[in-house]
């Protein structure tokens, strides 16, 4: 590639020719200045960055043109480039001239096309003006033809639809004609005509619509009266137990349902007949054989189990439920649930069972009033609740049977509450029953009540399951106590209000007869432990009543802990030392105590309890107490029913005792250190005597050698 710079010889020769001329001039700069300018020029050229994209593109263009780096080329380069630019611009001008000529020719063609379009548009407008009258006349003729055809079709359809032949009307209204499928087809057609006549009333000819509607109405009334007389005749010989009920009866009932007055008259007649039949059947099941001479002679009447209320009531409810289901199934087959839906069908079943419901209520109330076992009463409550739910689903919650069973459930539960209330009153007047036992265990009447409560909870669990049911159970009466926690009550909570709380209150009130606080606390603890043990396995009982029991036990445990703690202090003799060291206790002082000076540790040596003989006696008492301390402390609460509870209380009391002993030990060591001048300065005990000389020789520690570690080991 040719160099963009001239050869060295050329540059030097050129420089020499140029240099000779100025050298002879007196105005030329010195030689060293010219050489500096040349070096600066070369430096600026050589320092230029040829990595620049513009310079690189320019050099690449020059290289493609095949230009040699000569002085002539460098002089002509600008002129050549400008000449090429001028030539290119001239070429572009020529090309645009050709484009302008083409555009002129296109404009001429477009002008010609516009002229042609204008001529065609004129021809179209003139043709439209000539054909418009013809088209309008043809359209009017076609419209008239269509209207005539429509009127003809309408007349044919009207005659065929609204006019019923006289022979068909005779079949519909005449009493001697049979009620068959043809009768119902004619009836359906007449009803359709009557409904469609309403459309005629809104048209131009109202008179025609009124006449047709009046004629159809007379025919329909006669047909419905014919159906009513026929169904009355059929009801007299109808047997619901017969599975082959006539389909015509079902069809007639569906049709009569369109006339409520006639239909309800039929239902009234039917309900009265069924009420009489079912009442007689219920009385027959109670007192006589189940199915007469053709029945099973091994099946006894329900009255035979009247001595057992639960079985007696259960058998009656089972019979009523079976009869209700059978009656409903028979009525569903008879009416096909199409006349007024499920509600009307349930109402009809209710009316059929009015007499049965009356007899059932009388017998249940008599049985409950003559029975005094609360567990059996509660079982009857659950039985009634079960059947109440069953009949609510079967006949609806507003049905007579569902409301009757709800009333009987409330009545039975009220009788249950009365029995429990009477039992509480009997116990409250029996002073021997309220006397706490010698072993301070739960009183017998409470244990008996808890046995009854256990039976009640098992019954509830068998009926509803172990989980609490949030829906409220039978409403409590005025004789029952108000609920303690209405937010967490469940279906069993009213039972606890009657069967647990009064007996628990009686048991707690009987503790006042005990002579000491310790025996009262143990007695109350045993009562609450027994109740807690009874209700804990049953979530529906513990949900509402375990928390108050636990709170009371927590308070009683604190009292027992204090009793056990005082017993340890008194038996060990440590109480004497603690009482003497009370002024040295690190407790927060009151406002009056802040004015008093804090006693000095050295004053301990002057306390009567810390004199050598007294301290020796206390130490000996402690040594005698420690070997059997834990056993004696446990035996102190032996009448508490729960060994685990006693162990927990004793351990906490021992821990408190050890903390107090640690405090006494620390004060003894501090007093010895004070006496020897350790940790307190140079102060010494000046009050002398024979005893104090002995103390100074061995210190209080020698007279009271036990350590906290030894105490913890011996009491562990």
UniProtKB/Swiss-Prot annotation:
Name the principal localization, coarsely classed: Golgi
**Got any disulfides in this one, which pairs?**
none
Start-end of Low complexity biased regions: 12-26
Q: Which UniProt keywords apply?
A: Golgi apparatus, Membrane, Protein transport, Transport
Any keyword Protein transport?
yes
Cell location: Golgi apparatus membrane
- For the region Disordered, give the residue spans: 1-35, 463-491
Q: Which GO terms describe its biological process?
A: intra-Golgi vesicle-mediated transport; protein transport
Q: Which InterPro entries match?
A: COG6, COG6_C, COG6_N
Q: Name one GO cellular component term.
A: Golgi transport complex
State the annotated membrane topology for this chain: Peripheral membrane protein
SMART domains, per database record: COG6
Report if keyword Cell membrane is assigned: no
Pfam families attached here? COG6_C, COG6_N
Q: So which domain of life are we looking at?
A: Eukaryota
Q: Which family does it belong to?
A: Belongs to the COG6 family.
Q: By its UniProt entry, which PANTHER family does this protein fall under? A: COMPONENT OF OLIGOMERIC GOLGI COMPLEX 6, CONSERVED OLIGOMERIC GOLGI COMPLEX SUBUNIT 6
Summary of the function given for this chain in its UniProt record:
Acts as a component of the peripheral membrane COG complex that is involved in intra-Golgi protein trafficking. COG is located at the cis-Golgi, and regulates tethering of retrograde intra-Golgi vesicles and possibly a number of other membrane trafficking events.
State the protein's name: Conserved oligomeric Golgi complex subunit 6
This protein's species is: Aspergillus niger (strain ATCC MYA-4892 / CBS 513.88 / FGSC A1513)
């Amino acid at each position: 590639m040719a160099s963009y710079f001239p050869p060295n010889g050329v540059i030097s020769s050129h420089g020499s020719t140029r240099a000779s001329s100025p050298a002879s001039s007196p105005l030329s700069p010195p030689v060293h200045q010219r050489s500096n300018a040349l070096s600066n020029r070369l430096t600026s050229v050589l320092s230029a960055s040829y990595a620049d994209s513009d310079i690189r593109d320019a050099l690449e263009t020059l290289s493609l043109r095949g230009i040699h780096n000569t002085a002539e080329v460098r002089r002509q380069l600008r002129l050549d480039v400008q000449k090429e630019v001028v030539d290119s611009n001239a070429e572009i001008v020529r090309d645009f001239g050709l484009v302008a000529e083409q555009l002129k020719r296109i404009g001429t063609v477009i002008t010609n096309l516009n002229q042609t379009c204008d001529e065609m548009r004129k021809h179209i407008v003139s043709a439209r003006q000539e054909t418009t009258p013809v088209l309008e006349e043809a359209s009017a003729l076609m419209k008239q033809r269509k209207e005539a055809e429509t009127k003809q079709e309408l007349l044919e359809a009207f005659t065929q639809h609204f006019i019923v032949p006289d022979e068909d009307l005779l079949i519909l209204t005449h009493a001697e004609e049979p009620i068959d499928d043809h009768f119902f087809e004619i009836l359906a057609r007449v009803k359709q005509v009557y409904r469609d006549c309403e459309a005629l009333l809104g048209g131009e000819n109202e008179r025609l619509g009124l006449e047709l509607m009046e004629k159809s109405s007379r025919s329909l009334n006669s047909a419905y009266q014919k159906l009513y007389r026929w169904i009355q005749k059929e009801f007299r010989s109808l047997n619901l137990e017969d599975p082959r009920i006539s389909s015509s009866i079902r069809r007639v009932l569906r049709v009569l349902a369109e006339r409520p007055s006639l239909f309800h008259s039929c239902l009234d007649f039917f309900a009265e007949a069924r009420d009489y039949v079912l009442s007689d059947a219920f009385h027959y099941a109670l007192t006589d054989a189940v199915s007469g001479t053709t029945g099973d002679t091994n099946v006894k009447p329900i009255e035979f189990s009247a001595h057992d209320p639960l079985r007696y009531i259960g058998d009656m409810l089972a019979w009523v439920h079976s009869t209700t289901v059978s009656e409903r199934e028979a009525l569903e087959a008879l009416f096909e649930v199409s006349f007024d839906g499920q509600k009307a069908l349930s109402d009809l079943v209710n009316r059929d069972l009015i007499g049965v419901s009356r007899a059932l209520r009388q017998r249940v109330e008599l049985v409950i009033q003559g029975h005094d076992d609360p567990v059996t009463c509660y079982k009857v409550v659950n039985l009634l609740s079960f059947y109440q739910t069953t009949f609510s689903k079967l006949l609806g919650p507003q049905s007579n049977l569902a409301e009757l069973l709800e009333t009987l459930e409330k009545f039975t539960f009220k009788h249950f509450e009365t029995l429990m209330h009477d039992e509480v009153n009997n116990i409250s007047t029996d002073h021997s029953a309220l006397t706490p036992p010698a072993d301070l265990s739960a009183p017998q009447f409470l244990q008996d009540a808890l046995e009854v409560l256990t039976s009640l909870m098992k019954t509830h669990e068998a009926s509803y399951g172990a989980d609490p049911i949030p829906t409220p159970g039978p409403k409590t009466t005025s004789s029952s106590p108000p609920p303690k926690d209405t937010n967490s009550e469940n279906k069993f909570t009213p039972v606890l209000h009657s069967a647990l709380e009064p007996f628990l209150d009686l048991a707690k009130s009987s503790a006042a007869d005990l002579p000491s606080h310790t025996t009262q606390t143990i007695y109350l603890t045993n009562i609450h432990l027994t109740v807690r043990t009874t209700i804990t396995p049953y979530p529906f009982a513990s949900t509402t009543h375990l928390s108050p029991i636990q709170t009371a036990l927590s308070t009683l445990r604190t009292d027992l802990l204090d009793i056990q703690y005082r017993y340890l202090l008194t038996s060990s003799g440590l109480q004497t030392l603690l009482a003497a060291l009370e002024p040295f206790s690190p407790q927060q002082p009151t406002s009056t105590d802040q004015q008093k000076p804090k006693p000095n540790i050295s004053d301990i040596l002057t306390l009567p309890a810390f004199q050598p003989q007294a301290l020796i006696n206390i130490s000996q008492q402690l040594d005698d107490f420690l070997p059997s301390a834990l056993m004696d402390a446990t035996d102190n609460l032996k009448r508490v029913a729960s060994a685990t509870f006693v162990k927990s209380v004793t351990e906490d009391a021992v821990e408190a005792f050890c903390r107090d002993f640690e405090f006494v030990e620390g004060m003894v060591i501090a007093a010895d250190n004070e006496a020897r001048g350790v940790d307190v300065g140079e102060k010494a005990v000046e009050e002398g005597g024979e005893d104090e000389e002995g103390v100074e020789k061995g210190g209080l520690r020698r007279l009271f050698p036990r350590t906290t570690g030894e105490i913890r080991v011996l009491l562990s």
